[in-house]
């Protein structure tokens, strides 16, 4: 063996590896720079992106970011009569429509089969800088003209080439994989009720497509056919919340899923929320009364802010009471290690900022004695706020406070079925972040009728109705997507279609604007009409705090 030749060969190999590593790093850096332009409106220099629309005032920074119109997926949208086309590399540079390789293009909003492809990077750059299309005609005035140097343009085009390029994990030729996540402290009755709805809905979907129709092969097919089975994976968590993230990442690696549907939580959902956002997995409308309020997060979606919405509603009432009736002190009662503690902490912050005295009384131990002590010793000018579940509401003393206004969490207490003692009913105002029973009755005919037909007992009505609702929402959104199974696109379709739904279950209306992640935004404040029964009286209109 020639040592000199071996050394030269090793040096050449080292140089090749170094060059490949540098090329990969360079491509990655360019893509990251392009992403910053696309999503944030920030140039590689750190300066804000500049865009102009004719004689109008210019756009700058985040307001000029491409995703504002073309969406996070880059697949475009439709705004009234304005069609915003997809701008991912797949659609910008697509093969000629007359060639066989064009047959596997999937339908997305804004995509026209007769749209000519851009022949090269220079033509795309001209459209971005000058607003001149590939046919030489001026683009719609809504398309800004962007001031990008060559390096910035190259980074943006590199990002667009890779954007929404691959089908998402959890999608195979014949199956869509979904997970539902259940925390270890979740109510077992609600768990069984939720899973029964999910399993039956999935079975119905799969029965509908039984027979083995093949996946769509061409966007030229006239009729859309649902062809993929739905596979449900149940991810039961164990142990302390700080271990849930690692458990979920392990499950996702073992069982890749397209999205997480429904789910059931207890005292905290924070680790699940963080997992969904960090792993870019849509997590759709779990059954949790203490969701995570991070409006800038993209992937988790919720029906309501839950008890956080109740905090806002009660705070508004307390503010009114302070101005009109001399409120001086807010006394809050909650059970140890329950979601009421977080709600009480949030309301405490508001009360202290408002200059009110605050008292927190923690219920510990079984029986009615600890609770009776917690709701005693009240004075004129006090407001008593109860963050209690049904079992504790039932243990309230028979005699209500004589000299305090009482507020109750409806979500925790059980809404109209809360076992509030008769003497408490006239003096208690209950936050009610769902529609009134008589007003939701017609809409509830759909989920309740489905449960009856499927011979599923009603054991946790709100959980079952919300689970049925999210199944229907997901089915409708996937129908709109055809074969474009991309996670970001799923979120965007949900934003666009949710406000059009007639079947909204417990909620008077649902809707998600761009970037919004709570579909129902309002609440009633109610009181009971009678010493017994479930009839409620609204103390005003549906209110969005």
Region roles according to the model:
Residues 24-60:
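Electrostatic cytochrome c docking/interface patches
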Residues 27, 33, 118-134, 144-169:
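C-terminal capping alpha-helices of c-type cytochrome domains
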Residues 39-42, 68-75, 92, 129-133, ...:
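Detector for the c-type heme attachment site
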Residues 51-121, 142-148:
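Gly/Gly-Pro-rich "capping" loops immediately C-terminal to redox-active cysteine motifs
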Residues 173-175, 189-196, 208-295, 364-368, ...:
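Beta-alpha junction/loop-to-helix N-cap segments that form part of ligand/metal-binding clefts
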Residues 254-361, 404-430:
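Extracytoplasmic ligand/sensor domains, especially the bilobed periplasmic-binding protein
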Residues 300-304, 397-469, 539-544:
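Extracellular/periplasmic periplasmic-binding protein-like sensory domains
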Residues 450-465, 475-537:
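Segments of small-molecule ligand-sensing domains
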């Amino acid at each position: 063996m020639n040592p000199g030749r071996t050394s030269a060969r090793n040096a050449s190999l080292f140089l090749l590896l170094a060059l490949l590593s540098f090329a990969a790093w360079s491509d990655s850096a360019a893509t990251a720079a392009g992403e910053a332009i696309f999503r944030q409106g920030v140039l590689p220099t750190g300066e804000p992106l500049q865009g102009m629309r004719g004689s109008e005032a210019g756009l700058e920074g985040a307001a000029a970011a491409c995703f504002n119109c073309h969406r996070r997926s880059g697949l475009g949208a439709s705004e009234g009569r304005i069609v915003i086309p997809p701008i991912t590399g797949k659609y910008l540079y697509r093969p000629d429509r007359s060639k066989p390789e064009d047959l596997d293009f999937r339908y997305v909003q804004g995509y026209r089969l007769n749209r000519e492809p851009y022949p090269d990077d220079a033509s795309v750059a001209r459209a971005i800088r000058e607003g001149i299309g590939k046919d030489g005609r001026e683009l719609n005035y809504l398309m800004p003209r962007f001031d990008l140097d060559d390096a910035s343009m190259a980074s943006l085009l590199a990002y667009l080439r890779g954007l929404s390029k691959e089908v998402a994990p959890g999608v195979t030729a014949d199956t869509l994989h979904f997970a539902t996540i259940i925390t270890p402290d979740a109510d077992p009755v609600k768990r069984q009720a939720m899973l029964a709805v999910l399993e039956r809905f999935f079975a119905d979907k799969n029965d509908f497509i039984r027979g083995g129709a093949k996946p769509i092969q061409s966007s030229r097919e006239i009729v859309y056919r649902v062809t993929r089975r739905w596979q449900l994976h149940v991810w039961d968590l164990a142990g302390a919340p700080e271990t849930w993230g690692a458990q979920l990442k392990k499950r996702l690696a073992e069982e890749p899923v397209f999205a997480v549907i429904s789910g059931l939580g207890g005292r905290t959902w924070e680790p699940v929320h963080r997992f969904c956002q960090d792993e870019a997995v849509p997590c759709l409308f779990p059954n949790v009364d203490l969701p995570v309020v991070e409006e800038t997060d993209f992937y988790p979606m919720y029906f309501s802010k839950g008890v956080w919405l109740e905090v806002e509603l009660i705070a508004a009432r307390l503010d009114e009471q302070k101005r009109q009736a001399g409120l001086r002190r807010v006394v809050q009662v909650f059970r140890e290690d329950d979601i009421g503690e977080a709600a009480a902490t949030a309301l405490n912050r508001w009360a202290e900022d408002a200059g009110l005295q605050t008292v927190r009384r923690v219920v510990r131990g079984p029986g009615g004695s600890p609770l009776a002590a917690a709701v005693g010793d009240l004075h004129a000018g006090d407001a008593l706020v109860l963050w209690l579940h049904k079992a504790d509401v039932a243990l309230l003393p028979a005699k209500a406070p004589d000299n305090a206004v009482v507020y109750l969490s409806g979500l925790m207490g059980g809404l109209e079925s809360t076992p509030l003692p008769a003497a408490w009913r006239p003096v208690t105002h209950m936050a009610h972040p769902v529609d009134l029973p008589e007003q939701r009755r017609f809409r509830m005919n759909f989920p309740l009728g489905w449960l009856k037909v499927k011979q599923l007992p009603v054991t946790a009505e709100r959980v079952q109705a919300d689970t049925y609702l999210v199944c229907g929402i997901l089915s409708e959104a996937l129908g709109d997507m055809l074969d474009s199974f991309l996670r970001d696109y799923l979120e965007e379709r949900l934003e666009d279609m949710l406000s059009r739904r007639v079947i909204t279950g417990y909620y008077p209306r649902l809707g998600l604007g761009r970037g919004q992640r709570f579909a129902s935004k309002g609440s009633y404040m109610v009181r009971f009409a009678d010493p017994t029964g479930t009839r409620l009286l609204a103390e005003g209109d549906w209110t969005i705090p």
